Swiss-Prot record:
Zinc finger map (FPG-type): 229-263
Protein name: Endonuclease 8
Species classification: Bacteria, Pseudomonadati, Pseudomonadota, Gammaproteobacteria, Enterobacterales
Annotated source species: Salmonella enteritidis PT4 (strain P125109)
Active site feature: P2 (schiff-base intermediate with dna), E3 (proton donor), K53 (proton donor), R253 (proton donor)
Repeat found in the keyword field: no
Keyword Lyase included in the entry's annotation: yes
Domain of life: Bacteria
UniProt family annotation: Belongs to the FPG family.
Enzyme Commission identifier(s): 3.2.2.-, 4.2.99.18
Reactions catalysed: 2'-deoxyribonucleotide-(2'-deoxyribose 5'-phosphate)-2'-deoxyribonucleotide-DNA = a 3'-end 2'-deoxyribonucleotide-(2,3-dehydro-2,3-deoxyribose 5'-phosphate)-DNA + a 5'-end 5'-phospho-2'-deoxyribonucleoside-DNA + H(+)
Names of required cofactors: Zn(2+)
PROSITE patterns membership: FPG_CAT, ZF_FPG_1, ZF_FPG_2
Length: 263
């Protein structure tokens, strides 16, 4: 599943295609969304926001389209009038005079008012987004040490969207390698230097993935274009200490680590 940086880059592409342009045609596959087709035609997309792995498409009439790609959903940008060759099932089409954005295969799609945005179950549950520039390492540190999270092993905590939105498996692996920790640690057991390093890495690594294009090679995954240090590199030498990277399973997900320098 794509993680926060890939979702944000997808949102950037969608915004670049249609933001601020009048919608000339709107189509939804689901019956409960059909009444909104006429309401949105002629409106503008004002911005496309990410909350972790969810996308919020805001319209000039105050409505917001909530969508979560889950495992199979994917957005595409095409020239208006183009007919894509695909076997995917179309769910949403937002068309302007020159560009059209299409959502395929997703099933978690809703139209929300401004009030409903504040009470939506997923949006209420999800934690601060790691790509939100307003989120600071100090706030992350406080969250790590909060009663809710301080006793959780990092192997599961760094996959929990209620802790920080936008994290996922490759980010979990890379963050823990960066700070030299294994997934079995808990925030309550770290010293001050370790807490500070982890608090910064929890923001720095996702933001690096989002902002850089890095080396595009076999070490990329789901569009993550910065170079992996350990993810998918089992059997290779660790570039920090020369030890051999190993692969195991933590919290039911593949986990890559260097047993020589991650303690």
């Amino acid at each position: 599943m794509p993680e926060g940086p890939e979702i944000r880059r997808a949102a950037d592409n969608l915004e670049a295609a249609i933001k601020g342009k009048p919608l000339t045609d709107v189509w939804f596959a689901f019956a409960q969304l059909k009444p909104y087709e006429s309401q949105l035609t002629g409106q503008l997309v004002t911005r496309i926001e990410t909350r972790g792995k969810a996308l919020l498409t805001h319209f000039s009439n105050g409505l917001t389209l909530y969508s979560h790609n889950q495992l199979y959903g994917v957005w595409r940008v095409i020239d208006t009038g183009e007919i894509p060759q695909t076997t995917r099932i179309l769910r949403v089409r937002l068309q302007t005079a020159d560009k059209t954005i299409l959502l395929y295969s997703a099933s978690d799609i809703e139209m929300l008012t401004a009030e409903q945005l504040t009470t939506h179950p997923f949006l209420q549950r999800v934690g601060p987004d790691v790509l939100d520039a307003r989120l600071t390492p100090e706030e992350v540190k406080a969250r790590l040490l909060s009663p809710r999270f301080r006793n959780r092993q990092f192997s599961g905590l760094l996959l929990d969207q209620a802790f920080l939105a936008g994290l996922g498996n490759y980010l979990r692996v890379e963050i823990l390698w960066q700070v030299g920790l294994t997934g079995q640690h808990k925030a309550k057991d770290l010293n001050e230097a370790q807490l500070n390093a982890l608090s910064h890495a929890l923001l720095d690594i996702p933001r690096l993935s989002y902002t850089t294009r890095g080396q595009s090679d076999e070490n990329k995954h789901h569009g993550a274009l910065f170079r992996f240090k350990v993810f998918h590199r089992d059997g290779e030498a660790c570039e920090r200490c020369g030890g051999i990277i190993e692969k195991t399973t933590l919290s039911s997900r593949p986990f890559y680590w260097c047993p020589h320098c991650q303690k």
